[in-house]
Amino acid sequence: MINIGFFVEGQTERIFVEKLLSEYLTYPKYTIESVKLLGEKSAKITTKKNVSPEIKYNFLIYDVGCDEKVVSALLERADKMINQFKYYRLLALRDLHPEKRENKEKIINLVNNKFNEKSFKNHLGFILAIMEIESWFLADYNLFYRIDNILSPNYIKNKLNIDLIKDDPELYESPAAKVKKILSLVDIKYKKREKQSYNICHNIDYAFLCFSEEINNKISSFKYFVKCINESLNCF
């Protein structure tokens, strides 16, 4: 069995990764457990375990609760997870926001330098969503239509001058603000609450995001995230 760990900054990212994995792989070939870090302690949030002999992948997702702690939380646990519990890959996912766009390469290099100091550096990966994970949501331009059939791409363009089909969502300074504006058209307040995050993440077309070359070229950070997952899944 291949063990893969994810460290994410919050519940929206955690729910997105859970749903992405469940759409990307065939059940019952995997098991997923999500954990919320509470200081030095942790608490299980969701568990999708099974005892099928077909299980090939075991995923553990840590909801760190803060973008600044994603990498440090991974590094604090990496040695034990890799050497004792035999995790093949640990991936850290966080938003570039609130940092400025021009700091992107600086942050990536800083994290990779920290990883390179470790003997198990080849088992670590860092993904920076530009500017926020909501840019990945916006790339699925029919997402909002699935949430409410008033919210077609043309309707959104006419009302807000946001062209979901043509725009590069990674160029938005605040993708989350775009999501908030779009949902406000149907009187939905986007506050990243758990129920709301589930509703959004369960309406995303993950096959479209993963396998459309046009979309992959728009959201390069997501393309890299999927690449890291694929490398982990096919490690043996």
Segments (PLM) and residue ranges:
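Catalytic nucleophile-elbow at a beta strand-turn-alpha helix junction centered on a G-D-S/GDSL motif
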Residues: 6-15
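C-terminal accessory helical subdomains adjacent to catalytic cores in phosphodiester-
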Residues: 14-60, 68-236
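Extreme N-terminal starter segment of soluble prokaryotic enzymes
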Residues: 1-5
